[in-house]
């Protein structure tokens, strides 16, 4: 007969929606509109010339390769760390859990300086890696290391709540039915973790695409070799060439939005499939 309205913690729909839209407009849409206004000052030919400049294309390749390697590493290592933090109890677990958020709290410039000193030829890690003829600083590998460090929390914090909700009883039930631990993980746990894991890896990848502070200290910014797109944008801004900087940024922005939209679409379909079952 009559719809019974449940008590809500937040205010009414109109006020909540209005506040949310105001936040979106001021924090998200306003910067994007400024970017579009800068792009409007360029013709299509000028825009194409900027984004297809050989040096810019080389920076795109270095950025994408480094971000891809970093996100894959974070996917594996982040899943392992989330598993350890949720499935085991040991001394120092709380400290280890807190350390997973350190890249969020640490300024990226400080992270870059620290990584550069550790992986330099005379550094703690770099000296050992040099014995195997592996050089990290001033290479794309160093960029990947910096990107992985700054974006690892995205995977850990995305997968960890799902693992906590899943609980070990599902694995135990599978093992009582004759499955090995590896089979129970692959056939029971991993399918449930896949949406969260993919989302975490995607967030790690998109975060890495725009990394600047940690990268510039370990990459060396060698033209055609270790330049990333964020550095190219910074150089254009220093030259007061705002339209060119906006053009380069628009490519990374479009790639990030496309990836995030695809991930959200896949997650929505997965959610509907689970509800349907």
Swiss-Prot record:
Topological type in the membrane: Multi-pass membrane protein
Segments forming domain ABC transmembrane type-1: 60-263
Entry superkingdom: Bacteria
Pfam families linked to this entry: BPD_transp_1 (PF00528)
Keyword rRNA-binding on entry: no
UniProt GO MF annotations: ABC-type sulfate transporter activity
Transmembrane segments: 17-37, 64-84, 99-119, 136-156, 185-205, 215-235, 243-263
Matches recorded under InterPro entries: CysT_permease, MetI-like, MetI-like_sf, Sulph_transpt2
Keyword Cell inner membrane: yes
Location of the protein in the cell: Cell inner membrane
Principal place of residence: membrane
GO terms of biological process kind: sulfate transmembrane transport; thiosulfate transport
GO cellular-component term (any): plasma membrane
UniProt keyword list: Cell inner membrane, Cell membrane, Membrane, Sulfate transport, Transmembrane, Transmembrane helix, Transport
Biological role: Part of the ABC transporter complex CysAWTP (TC 3.A.1.6.1) involved in sulfate/thiosulfate import. Probably responsible for the translocation of the substrate across the membrane.
NCBIfam families, per the entry: 3a0106s02 (TIGR00969), permease_CysT (TIGR02139), PRK10971.1 (NF008208)
Known partners and oligomeric status: The complex is composed of two ATP-binding proteins (CysA), two transmembrane proteins (CysT and CysW) and a solute-binding protein (CysP).
Family: Belongs to the binding-protein-dependent transport system permease family. CysTW subfamily.
Protein name: Sulfate transport system permease protein CysT
Source species: Escherichia coli (strain K12)
Gene (name only): cysU
